[in-house]
Amino acid sequence: MRVIQSICEMRHYRAGIANDKTIGFVATMGALHQGHLSLMKASLAENDYTIVSIFVNPTQFGANEDFGAYPRTLEADIALCERVGVSAIFAPSIDDMYEDDEVGFSAPKKMGYILEGFDRPTHFAGVLQIVLKLFCLIKPHRAYFGQKDAQQVLILQKMVRDLFLDIHIVPCPIQRDSDGLALSSRNIYLSASERQKALCIPRTIELVKKRILQGEREVATLREIALQSLQSEDITLFYAQFCNHKLEPITHIVENKSIFLIAAKVGQTRLLDNLWI
């Protein structure tokens, strides 16, 4: 396994891969967990090469967010990737990836400033900026992203379509801890009592899923069930919303190819979860 830390070396490595070989890519900010490993394993199963990036991207953090505190565990991450069997890690510096007076990026006007983008208006512009840079360097055939970040997945799929990129965005199922909480690098911020409170989020997802499987499709009814479940704990709810794959709100009947998205703060930690229908 190669550990690559410069753009020059990344370009050299990529140029050495034969044209008839496929490349899978997993973009991460490090602090790797089993959710990331599931993305790597999906890539390893479908591609000749799997490249993982580890880069805590400053442009997707807001002014009062946790960029400085975000966990950085590069040595452990490298060991984990080596055990899984990925081909290469790309772990550049901020100075390598960004120059002064960068070309500006913006998120899609409809998709990028609702839900997560409402509370974090610069977030998706930063995500698109770094992912496009990484795509340009690595030139993958497939890129693997977790469905936990549903809005991110849909916006990246739109970017690929809009820019005519020959890259397939592969959404991968949410991975959960034994207690049901969706895996996230930020879960380490939770105290034991906060984690117990946070479990109302996956319980709500399961409750909504169960009612849909039983035949309930009225949005108002399902949302009321969800809100009652979420209000059982002392958490700050940002949204509990049914949307289609264009992130347009569904207000009457839940149909196939819908998503139920939840974002809530437990203590000081923002948590996401969702149900793909």
UniProtKB/Swiss-Prot annotation:
It is found in: Cytoplasm. (R)-pantoate binds at residues 60, 152. Keywords: ATP-binding, Cytoplasm, Ligase, Nucleotide-binding, Pantothenate biosynthesis. ATP binds at residues 29-36, 146-149, 183-186. InterPro entries: Pantoate_ligase, Pantoate_ligase_C, Rossmann-like_a/b/a_fold. GO terms for cellular component: cytosol. It catalyses: (R)-pantoate + beta-alanine + ATP = (R)-pantothenate + AMP + diphosphate + H(+). Pfam families: Pantoate_ligase. Its EC number is 6.3.2.1. GO terms for biological process: pantothenate biosynthetic process. It is an enzyme of class 6 (ligase). The active site is at residue 36. GO terms for molecular function: ATP binding; pantoate-beta-alanine ligase activity. Beta-alanine binds at residue 60. It comes from the Bacteria. HAMAP family: PanC (MF_00158). Catalyzes the condensation of pantoate with beta-alanine in an ATP-dependent reaction via a pantoyl-adenylate intermediate. Homodimer. Belongs to the pantothenate synthetase family. The reaction proceeds by a bi uni uni bi ping pong mechanism. This is Pantothenate synthetase.
